[in-house]
Amino acid sequence: MKQICSILLFFLASAGSYAQNFADYFQNKTLRVDYIFTGNNKQQAIYLDELSQLPSWAGREHHLSELPLEGNGQIIVKDLATGQCIYKHSFSSLFQEWLSTDEAKETARGFENSFLLPYPKQPAEVEVVLFTPRKEVMTSFKHIVRPEDILIHKRGTTHVTPHRYMLRSGNEKECIDVAILAEG
């Protein structure tokens, strides 16, 4: 009985020690990464279009290196110094749906895709991977993000669209804002 308790205690202690702390790797900002997915049903490519910094992060801060859902694509952020995975996100893209159409057999097209990632404190490697329906790698693209890079555009601090809160139930870390937009 003592052995079982000690083994159980060991596993609980080691599981808690692996928990990743958001503040160790990320700032309270958002990195918007814009990509262009291009190609046809025979050949695909991914190109980096633009990097932008937004004023705060409103995404998850726990279980950062785990995939909450499985899609036909993934973004993996690794700490450049250690190679450790510090953030993962899955997605499904319109580009990959389009690849199954008849048009994709005859012509190549490009689709814009934007992803919001937590803003790293240190240089990080970002990898985008697209999968086939059988979960084989279709194409991938890696690039380095250096947080102090002057080519990362700062957005969201000026030219903010006028808005008003009808009800503010708490701070942004605990509540979700709902926007109501008129048609037209």
What function would you assign to each model-found segment?
Residues I4-A13:
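Sec-dependent N-terminal signal peptides
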Residues Y25-V160:
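Beta-strand-enriched, solvent-exposed domains that form extended recognition/catalytic surfaces
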Residues L151-G184:
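Fold-level signature of zinc-dependent metallopeptidase catalytic domains
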Residues L8-L9, Q20-D24, Y35:
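Short non-domain terminal segments
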